[in-house]
């Protein structure tokens, strides 16, 4: 899971935080946002490990067979968007170095990344394994160099643009709430729920904090709000393109995998052709997404927390039913593939669907507080109120 959080885009978010916040504000934003992400993903990790189900299977129980199309679409759509962001993050600085239009690089990079996700090239797994220590080493070198050359962290962070801390918290949460929402896809194979929660929480607290710190120190020192340009300004252009490019490639593979699963749940079609469609759409939208990066993060921060909130809330509200399904799988009465196709699975669980819509609306429109927390609280309130209404109607 630690490698999962070593994400180049998080370093670019860190660069934006470094330019916008002073040192105290940066620490506060990363601490609060990191705690929200760790709690959110830790709860999802627990549910995934206890049930052995991925996001789409859990969604069919909590949202219903057709209601699950809503979370599947939102998570798949946002992961497809992250794929596009990753393509653009690599293509734009590469094109500037080569002094060419970025579109050829976008199309080539997007095509190669889509092909590797489609064919499941084993070499990409090796690249993923190697890129984690390499990105840690490159980020540490960049951060230490910037700190020494800038005369210390306090001086580096002195010239800020006055970003509100709560905006910074939103960027932190938005940077990984989409990937974090897919946590059960990875922890469903965990040996125990305890180990799944511990590794997930440590990964998000440690991994994300490191990524934000690498980007923030370099961003504050150079005045650049994109990690590629930060490292180019530090004379690290070639290492940045190789190491960060490899990291983007591997994370984009994971993004298309999650996208394919979500679209497959909606269409009941094989996953692989849908991976190609998602890769094409993500590639075509890459430059637009990059140009609207902060708005994209704000959208994710407000709209995605309600999905994971419902998955966790439904599990704890119906723990015995979930446990019965797990026991049925363990005893061979049903197969693991049939866990979400039982007769008890509803067509649409309206309390869940309405709760997500209400939570997203509150997170997007309420101007005070922390958007993700506002969305979570509203989702829980509407979800349990809706369950109460449905229970009285029976």
Predicted regions and their residues:
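Hydrophobic, membrane-embedded alpha-helices of multi-pass small-molecule transporters
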Residues: 1-11, 143-149, 157-218, 231-253, ...
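Membrane-interface loop-to-helix entry segments
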Residues: 91, 104-109, 113-146, 159-160, ...
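Transmembrane alpha-helical segments of multi-pass small-molecule transport proteins
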Residues: 32, 69-76, 97-119, 133-143, ...
